[in-house]
Amino acid sequence: MREVLLSECIDLLYESHFVISKPFGRSCFDLIAKKGNLRLLIKILKNIDSLSTEQSEELLNISKMLQAVPVIIGTRTRNSVMEEGAVYERYGIKAVTFNTFREQLVGEPPVVYANRGGFFVNIDGKVLRETREKLKISVGELAEVSRVSRKTIYKYEQNEANPSAEVAIKIEEYLDVPLIKGINIMDCIDGLKSQKSRDDAFEKILKEGEDFKIRVIDILGDMGFNLLETTKAPFDAVAEESKGEDAENQNIIFTNIQETENEEIRRKAMIVDEISKILNSHSLLVLEKKTNENKRITSMSISELEKIGDTVDLLDFIEKRKKSTK
């Protein structure tokens, strides 16, 4: 079921003129898609409650670094089938069905979101208050019609609470005015979780016996890169030299770190290189010792990395290596 859903998402994104990465398993996301300035990190799950806390934290952190929107596409929750046209949320990440995602891509956003206690909608509290006052309808009268308290109506008008879909429809019909607002699942999430400290990330990597990765990440950090270490992605770290808030002005290096090179490492590095091209960024494979040169992969030994002065020097090295292999 998951593989079918993944295939359908790939087809849909291509039809919608997105540039997408090849799918890869055992990651906090399955696809990266880009169209114009919109960047999506998509996770496909049959059961959206199977997303772990660790996966969600990493997905949010990578999204923040890449200025991308994380989206989960699934078919059910732990307890029930997901409703079409409704937005669910897991760990701050929006989750929808395939059909709801497709409708969003053609400009028809969902209007209902699932929360504890049922399904709710976002309404325009200002329009609600102005219309009620214009029609000289009291708060008490509207509360009685809607079968909610006066206090609740006040909260709706101040955008401090949202009604259920049923209550919102009653209010719209009584006032004869549209109030329900669509939910754009492609909006960037405000206040994405901050990255964990490097000490926390190092502690986890050390537990896994990854001393070599610690050495490489330390070197990159000393150069002046902002770093995000990962354990649930096809790359081991994201190094950022930011020149501003605009994603197009970022210099990002997706970094794979391995002591020895083998076919599996090369395959992963080529996938990461593809991701870097989609996002107009860079990829780098750092090894203990370089073996045979693979023209499709930009790689260097740790001894070469140690000789690099700063972020500018490393980016220049990568650019020159790219040009020499064309």
Swiss-Prot record:
PROSITE patterns: HTH_CROC1. SUPFAM superfamilies: lambda repressor-like DNA-binding domains (SSF47413). Residues 139-158 bind DNA. The keyword Transcription applies. Coiled coil: none annotated. CDD domains: HTH_XRE. It holds the Pfam family HTH_3. NCBIfam families: PRK04140.1. It comes from Methanococcus maripaludis (strain DSM 14266 / JCM 13030 / NBRC 101832 / S2 / LL). This is Putative HTH-type transcriptional regulatory protein MMP0678. Keywords: DNA-binding, Transcription, Transcription regulation.
